[in-house]
Amino acid sequence: MSVIKMTDLDLAGKRVLIRADLNVPVKEGKVTSDARIRASLPTIEAALKQGAKVMVTSHLGRPTEGEYNEEFSLLPVVNYLKEKLGAENVSLAKDYLDGVELAAGKLVVLENVRFNKGEKKDDETLSKKYAALCDIFVMDAFGTAHRAQASTHGVGKFAPVACAGPLLSAELEALGKALKSPARPMVAVVGGSKVSTKFDVLNSLVKIADTVIVGGGIANTFVAIENNVGKSLYEPDFVDAAKKLRDEYGIPVPVDSRVGTEFSETAPSTVKKVSEVQDNEEIMDFGDETALAMANLLKDAKTILWNGPVGVFEFPNFRKGTEIVANAIADSDAFSIAGGGDTLAAIDLFGIEDKISYISTGGGAFLEFVEGKVLPAVAMLEERAKQ
């Protein structure tokens, strides 16, 4: 994949606009999880260090487009950045489309792009206004690379130079390493509640990976091929498709499960064979035999791609399966890449962040890349690199 990289450019004295992913959770004006800002900081700091006049922007939440709404302001992010970079070095610009005051080595945060009408539609006029603000546009938001919007795609078409930031470059390299030429055996773990939302991902992965492990509600649909799954979350419409995948690609199906009679944090759990699940019970996690068998498959892997927990790990009584699988991934010598919100929460809970080779910041973009889809922002960068 040939794109211009920010690290290859001289940024000194240049007006640099970085599109980052600073879409973080905010409560009472404070950032409650700073993972995305931390991931973006090295890019911002590298540009400042070179003496660039730096602007950074992002979306946050889902405001009504074209209207300012304090609830979705990037101000909490600005306050966080002031703590990291010094209050005198960071400011917030609310109205910036007609130009903004910049200084070398200083950072101006441009307010939430979704306050601008035309952002989501990739409006050309808006894209040109963004482009006019900068000499170099840096796309560094992998999490929104699958959306063709004015601040992720359109701006790059019209900016004098458009390049990939270090975070985006690292994401693309890590995913490329896992999917384009994986060291074998490659094992993929796909969890989550619905087969329907991950069907394209499963279809892609069975052709790339040597083994695909399914967990969560997805696994229940596979269990339902030959068993009663009681009140479990599963998709009857996808049982035939699941059977086809199982038969054709040898997807391992759980042999035992942790079940409960109600979906609640305090519900007691019982381990039983999948063939013994009663009508009033629901499967909420792998049983021990299944979890250990899956861990065994992961032990010898050379590449692991993990998307989604294998059980309701938020409930202490239904956590063990995800914990066993997570620790097997952490203890493996494989190149491991993990992505998706719930996956990151599980990594956090079990404290294994340092043991995963690469943690992707993208949710939808991660899945679309795995499905083999073209990400509009990446396609734009490739196009610009040819010019």
Curated annotation (Swiss-Prot):
Which stretches are annotated as coiled coil?
none
Read off the InterPro entries from this record: Phosphoglycerate_kinase, Phosphoglycerate_kinase_CS, Phosphoglycerate_kinase_N, Phosphoglycerate_kinase_sf
- Annotated binding of ATP, by residue: K198, E314, G340, G341, D342, T343
Per UniProt, what is one Pfam family of this protein? Answer: PGK
Q: Where does the record say this protein resides?
A: Cytoplasm
The chemistry this enzyme catalyses reads: (2R)-3-phosphoglycerate + ATP = (2R)-3-phospho-glyceroyl phosphate + ADP
Its pathway, per UniProt, is: Carbohydrate degradation; glycolysis; pyruvate from D-glyceraldehyde 3-phosphate: step 2/5
* Residues annotated for substrate binding in this entry: D21, L22, N23, R36, H59, L60, G61, R62, R114, R147
Any one GO CC term of the record: cytosol
Q: What is its EC number?
A: 2.7.2.3
Q: Name one GO biological process term.
A: gluconeogenesis
Q: Which GO terms describe its molecular function?
A: ADP binding; ATP binding; phosphoglycerate kinase activity
Keywords, comma-separated and alphabetical: ATP-binding, Cytoplasm, Glycolysis, Kinase, Nucleotide-binding, Transferase
Q: Where is the signal peptide?
A: none
Q: Which HAMAP family would you find in this protein's record?
A: Phosphoglyc_kinase
Stored PANTHER family:
PHOSPHOGLYCERATE KINASE, PHOSPHOGLYCERATE KINASE 1, CHLOROPLASTIC-RELATED
Report quaternary structure and partners: Monomer.
Family per UniProt? Belongs to the phosphoglycerate kinase family.
UniProt name for this protein: Phosphoglycerate kinase
Which taxonomic lineage is given here?
A: Bacteria, Pseudomonadati, Pseudomonadota, Gammaproteobacteria, Enterobacterales
